[in-house]
Amino acid sequence: MSMTDPIADMLVRIKNAASVGKPNVRFPFSKVKLAIALVLKHEGYIFDAKVIQGDNSKSDIEVVLKYFEGRPVIRILKRVSRSGLRKYCGKAELPKVLGGLGVSIISTSKGIMTDSKARESGVGGEVLCFVA
């Protein structure tokens, strides 16, 4: 059976692993998932994201989660644009999360980036998720 929303699956795996205190989490590889994980790393929500070569030439992404005083750094991880309802925003309407304390991850024509980088680049795109 095929998965309908692999990005939502990735986000749920990260959220569930963080809520029970796991040090890391693995999920199947895709270029979009890796780009999202690298944005999370760059923004300081996770320690590391790396590609692990698995059996039968299938790769996984391993994310090392980050905790502060025993609590997960990622408090909110919400999928916005989904397969049944896509959410697109122009450069003027890019959403801010918690008044700028969190980030929106946007898929643009220039790649996957945060809402602030999309504003700097002057591009809009599909709002993939909110992180805080």
From Swiss-Prot:
<dbReference type="GO" id="GO:0006412">
    <property type="term" value="P:translation"/>
</dbReference>
<dbReference type="GO" id="GO:0003735">
    <property type="term" value="F:structural constituent of ribosome"/>
</dbReference>
<comment type="function">
    <text>One of the primary rRNA binding proteins, it binds directly to 16S rRNA central domain where it helps coordinate assembly of the platform of the 30S subunit.</text>
</comment>
<comment type="subunit">
    <text>Part of the 30S ribosomal subunit. Contacts proteins S5 and S12.</text>
</comment>
<dbReference type="InterPro" id="IPR000630">
    <property type="entry name" value="Ribosomal_uS8"/>
</dbReference>
<keyword id="KW-0694">RNA-binding</keyword>
<keyword id="KW-0689">Ribosomal protein</keyword>
<dbReference type="Pfam" id="PF00410">
    <property type="entry name" value="Ribosomal_S8"/>
</dbReference>
<keyword id="KW-0699">rRNA-binding</keyword>
<dbReference type="InterPro" id="IPR035987">
    <property type="entry name" value="Ribosomal_uS8_sf"/>
</dbReference>
<comment type="similarity">
    <text>Belongs to the universal ribosomal protein uS8 family.</text>
</comment>
<dbReference type="GO" id="GO:0019843">
    <property type="term" value="F:rRNA binding"/>
</dbReference>
<keyword id="KW-0687">Ribonucleoprotein</keyword>
<protein>
    <recommendedName>
        <fullName>Small ribosomal subunit protein uS8</fullName>
    </recommendedName>
</protein>
<dbReference type="GO" id="GO:1990904">
    <property type="term" value="C:ribonucleoprotein complex"/>
</dbReference>
<dbReference type="GO" id="GO:0005840">
    <property type="term" value="C:ribosome"/>
</dbReference>
<dbReference type="InterPro" id="IPR047863">
    <property type="entry name" value="Ribosomal_uS8_CS"/>
</dbReference>
